[in-house]
Amino acid sequence: MKKVLVLGASGYVGSQLLPLLLEQGYQVTAAARHIDYLKARTEPHDNLSLEYLDLADQAATQALVPDFDLIFFLVHGMAEGHDFIDYELNLARNFVSALGPKNQHVIYLSSLQPQTGDSEHLQARKQTGQLLRKGPVPVTELQAGVIIGPGSAAFEIMRDFVYNLPIMIAPKWVDSKANPIALQNLNHYLLKLAQDTPSESQTFEVGGPDIVSYRNQFAHIAKTADRPLRLWATSLLTPQIASYWLGVVTSVPSNIGRALLAGLKHDFIASSTIIREKYPQKLISFDSMVEQAIHSEGNFVKSNVWGFDKTAFKRWQAGYGYYPKKTGASITSSASLDSLWHVAQQIGSPKQGYFFANALWRTREWLDLLFGGGVPVRQMPEGPTLKVGDKIDSWKVIRCEENQFLSLLFGMKGPGLGRLEITVSDHGDSRELNISAWWHPKGFLGLLYWFAMMPAHLFIFKGMVKAIEKQAKEQMKD
């Protein structure tokens, strides 16, 4: 069986492709820069290994890439900001220079190219494909438009707009057309291509069976979610202006969202006859793919990100944002890892409280009555060290890795689902302490709640990391 390398495995398509490759018996290595995120979302498997890889590191790339028969290139640079084209092409160059005699096939997931016009995102995809084909290994480029599935950036942007905006004013591109493809259908093509070893490079366009305007896509998402849709289109609102709302309305990373929006002013209609004849399958209708995506969004809670916690899964509700809002604070310290962890894991104890602004923490507990909660209940772990399942007041420990990581499930009432994370990292000559809050808002009220709480969060978390570090240093002196 082929040895398979998945580059960009922590991304949307890559993370969902991994279990399918394993089911078919491949020996898979998943590589990503965001290796901690990948580990948290991936279940262990005998045929799966996880590797940290930054393709910008040419030496590391050349050490890893040559050992595989098949390579999925699922990398993009949209999260890097305005200069991502040069960044993305540099990654592709490093990858091509690392290809060796053992490599037989590269599968590159790209974007459809419109007949007229383009954007930086589309240009980057096009130029990356051209660069990959200059290498010594046959490349299959799969050009896809909008992918519909839980976690797809384009889908989640539309879904968040429907759930979070009482009134939607859209650019004229809302009447552009596309034939979105279901994630399930895309995976079928990827898995079939994995079985082939072509002698020369090839390119396929892939799309779904229905050509739908973005206006009608919004309408069906709203209908499926049982939400009202009040949408007006105007030429005064450009995709560039609309992109500035992304950080407020949706939790999809803003740089990725802006890159996608810039390309949506074009029609994206795939001509997929060739690949449909070569790898036949029943294509899922647009209506069905939206229904499947919305109804299965909560499944991602069943992952190590949430400690496979049953309480978190039970509390998930339709309408919660797939991607979370996040805020936090960090500090770099000379204190030891052990001392920082020893102090941090005392969170909520009678001695420490929450390290800083305890009155604000207690005030929020009593405000829970306004959200339909009960009178605050004081709860503490039985033992001297924390373990999964322990209760700290209204919080529940859902993950605990000694001297590294602590995750607490938010137990109070609120329009969303949240968790608090404390991370301690050793960087050799220094340590980093990070405290972050993650919030999956439920609709417009969930967003209002998040932004109303953000000033307090920033104030409290900055004070917390300083207080923990101070105590850790004092402990080292004793």
Region roles according to the model:
Residues 4-24:
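N-terminal Rossmann NAD(P)H-binding glycine-rich loop of SDR-like oxidoreductase domains
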Residues 36, 42-100, 112-115:
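NAD(P)H-binding glycine-rich loop region in Rossmannoid oxidoreductase-like domains
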Residues 193-256, 267-329, 336:
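Mid/C-terminal beta-alpha module of Rossmann-like enzyme folds, strongest
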Residues 287, 446-478:
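A conserved amphipathic terminal alpha-helix motif
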